[in-house]
């Protein structure tokens, strides 16, 4: 049952929401539900306009969230993830710093989601 805190220079203040345990909604879906203005164009992992930076806030070890093939390809294309980071996520369960909000389904851990407000803007 994670708390997800959204922060961006385009927001007046940070906003924290509670994600229900077992919910399979993506960060983008949760943001839309709570009127948090993460930019997006396709919502399907093709355009990378919903690029976010994720910081883990728990004291427990961070868990990697499965990277989809589309997400891996787009993040590599943007040079926002390395082959080593992908391997660390898949083999050692170490989360990458950058994700696509439309592909990232939060687990049971508190995270800070930072976005610039510019589609595809690097954080």
UniProtKB/Swiss-Prot annotation:
Cofactor(s) required for function per UniProt: [2Fe-2S] cluster
Pfam family, one: Fer2
Sorted UniProt keywords: 2Fe-2S, Electron transport, Iron, Iron-sulfur, Metal-binding, Nitrogen fixation, Transport
2Fe-2S ferredoxin-type domain residues: 2-119
Note accompanying the cofactor annotation: Binds 1 [2Fe-2S] cluster.
InterPro entries: 2Fe-2S_ferredoxin-like_sf, 2Fe-2S_ferredoxin-type, 2Fe2S_fd_BS, Beta-grasp_dom_sf
Binding site residues for [2Fe-2S] cluster: 42, 47, 50, 102
Any Gene Ontology biological process: nitrogen fixation
Molecular functions (GO terms): 2 iron, 2 sulfur cluster binding; metal ion binding
UniProt keyword ATP-binding, yes or no: no
PROSITE patterns according to UniProt: 2FE2S_FER_1, 2FE2S_FER_2
Job description of the protein: Ferredoxins are iron-sulfur proteins that transfer electrons in a wide variety of metabolic reactions. This ferredoxin probably participates in nitrogen fixation.
UniProt family annotation: Belongs to the 2Fe2S plant-type ferredoxin family.
Name the record gives this protein: Ferredoxin-5
Organism name: Rhodobacter capsulatus
């Amino acid at each position: 049952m994670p708390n997800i805190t959204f922060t961006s220079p385009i927001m007046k203040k940070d906003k924290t929401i509670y994600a229900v345990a077992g919910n399979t909604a993506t960060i983008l879906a949760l943001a839309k539900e709570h009127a948090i203005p993460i930019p997006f164009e396709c919502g399907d992992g093709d355009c990378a306009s919903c690029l976010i930076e994720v910081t883990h806030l728990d004291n427990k070890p961070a868990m990697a969230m499965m990277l989809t093939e589309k997400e891996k390809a787009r993040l590599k294309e943007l040079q926002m993830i390395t082959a080593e980071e992908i391997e660390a996520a898949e083999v050692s369960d170490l989360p990458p710093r950058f994700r696509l909000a439309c592909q990232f389904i939060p687990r049971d851990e508190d995270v800070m989601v930072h976005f610039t407000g510019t589609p595809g803007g690097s954080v």
